Amino acid sequence: GMAGGSGEQALLTSGAVQLANFYGFSNSTIAGATDSKGDDAQSGLEKSLNITMAAQSGANLITQAAGTQAGLMVSSFTACVIDNDMIGSIARSLADIPVNVDTLSLELIESTVNNEGHFLGAKDTFSRMKSDFLYPKVSDRTSVDEWTMAGRVDISQKATIKAKEILKDYFPNHIKPDFIKEIRNNFEIKIETHKMRSQ
């Protein structure tokens, strides 16, 4: 069968996207399929390889990139949360590195070299920490000691907790209440709106 998370699939997708771009066609591709059955290292390896290659090849739209497992046969809320961090990192890696008078900060460099010897107290550093860094929701960037003291919680455990938090209070609001009322008036929908919320 198809090995959607394989390097060969990544290569084929990359080639197809580059051909579409060469001929001036808008393009859409799936990427992020994995043959893994769970939220494990294989899943991360296959998804990140395929999504990164599709993105770096210039895909206009990448679909089916988050939450699926087992060759697109299973959807996982935990995987959606993990994949959100992964896709954020991939998107961040595609950004340009702006080089201009502001980003070079030559005066700050001169002042730092001649004074404190570090940039930690500079307003510019703090500002860039807010704009230039992606802070993941569940990926762990702590030290081994901090991670151990916090209970050695892995990414799947953190993502499961985060998914439950999101689903607990989430209710779609992209359909206006008037439309929902009209739909309910025209179709026999047996489940009440308040029961559609996660318990």
Name the predicted role of every residue range.
Residues 1-86:
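Glycine-rich anion/phosphate-binding loop at the beta-strand->alpha-helix junction
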Residues 78-199:
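Catalytic-core signal marking the mid-to-C-terminal active-site face
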